[in-house]
Amino acid sequence: MLTGFKNAVEVDFTLEENKKKIEEAFKQAHAEAGAVYPLIIGGKKVETEKKIASVSPATKEVLGYACSCSKEQADEAIKASYEAFKKWSLTSVEERVRVLRRLAALLIENRFIMDAWNVLESGKNWGEADGELCEQLDFINSYVMHIQNLEKGKELV
């Protein structure tokens, strides 16, 4: 049996300091509303004329615009992902662990703004949004633990 895994703990929004942090995050998100988000194909930003509006289901506010890709751009992105996978498949366990831990650290560092955007874009409440972020952290941390154990020849269960 594997030991050492602990689930991420959800933010307690009854604490005043956390309420202030999420309220500041909402201010930041509203200030960023209306931004255009480009495609990223092979690491390069690509803006397109056609955009898809992200609209809050609760307020109907336009939160931003995602660039819409053509079939050719989708094909190009798929090709780029295959190339990235080839490189990633040669990446050492240590480097994969480093990358995943960095991802988890970035999620924690940006937790409140991530929660605020999730609330605005999905209509979820604060706790549900943070619960989803915790689930992301749990998956990442679980993957890290499992790849390290596989590298040591341990079984997953």
Predicted regions and their residues:
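Extended, amphipathic, non-transmembrane alpha-helical segments
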Residues: I108-M114
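Secondary-structure edge/capping motif, primarily at the C-terminal ends of alpha-helices
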Residues: F85-W88, E121
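Terminal low-complexity tails and localization/encapsulation signals of metabolic enzymes
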Residues: M1-E72, E76, E83, L90, ...
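Short linear capping/connector segments at secondary-structure termini
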Residues: W117-K124, E155-V157
